Amino acid sequence: MPFDRAVEYYDRTRGLSEEASTAMTVLLSSELRGRGRTLEIGVGTGLVALPLAAAGVPLVGLDLSAPMLAKLVEKAGGRPPFPLVVGDATTLPFEEHRFEAAVVRHVLHLVPAWRQAVAELVRVVAPGGLVLVSSGQVPEPWHELTDRFMDRVGRPSFAVALDSWETGAIVQAFRAHGAETRRLPRIPERVAQTMAEFLDQMAAGLHSWTWEVDEEERREAVAELRLWAVERWGSLDPPGGRDVAIEWHAFDLH
């Protein structure tokens, strides 16, 4: 699904701390450097790609949203830092074996035909190449809050029975194409956002899984959720933040 409406706040809801972003760039560039051209699907505003490009990784970025790509160009100083393509991850506009590697962060759970997207990645990345995939990492209470919200208002139409933080089904899909799997070292991150702030974002409709819900119903659901969360955890603003681990899987293709 295109993220046109999220352009101006996307980085605020998906960004990492400077320390975690640097560690992620070091980790990914160590896997990608020397492999040749790398494709990132769902490149968005360049949260992953811009630091990788600065680290010397040759890239092509693809996204369904032209406004997101325009924001990437703006962040890069007004000129495309590498080739950018508006396109669909399930029908990649590239010939077979065009790339040596691919990067996928927080994308597959948004793609109804996500297994087709996996097949397309396997098609366009050459044998001996590499696909790096990361799902979402959020503190455990965020999972519970999100699930309870969806139980109240219904699942979004793009829901694909693949949670944003799930990796097991993705691993199985790549293995079905003969890929070998490696789990890369975890990157520690501390989420400073409180539950109250997360609920504020939910009420404001900043997350894709809230976009199909009528505003009045959304705000009523979040108001109920706040009361429930206080009963469940006692406070929506615990001190010190919460620790999460950023996980990447490497799929070596044959």
Name what the model sees in each region.
Residues 39-41, 45-91:
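Class I SAM-dependent methyltransferase SAM/SAH-binding core
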Residues 115-127:
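A short glycine-rich, Lys/Arg-flanked "PGG" loop and its adjoining helix->strand segment in the class I
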Residues 162-177:
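Short alpha-helix
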Residues 17, 45, 180-254:
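Conserved Class I S-adenosyl-L-methionine
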Residues 106-110:
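Short catalytic micro-motifs in class I SAM-dependent methyltransferases
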Residues 1-36, 47-51, 68-71, 75, 130-161:
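Conserved class I S-adenosyl-L-methionine
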Residues 103:
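A conserved beta-strand element that flanks and buttresses the S-adenosyl-L-methionine
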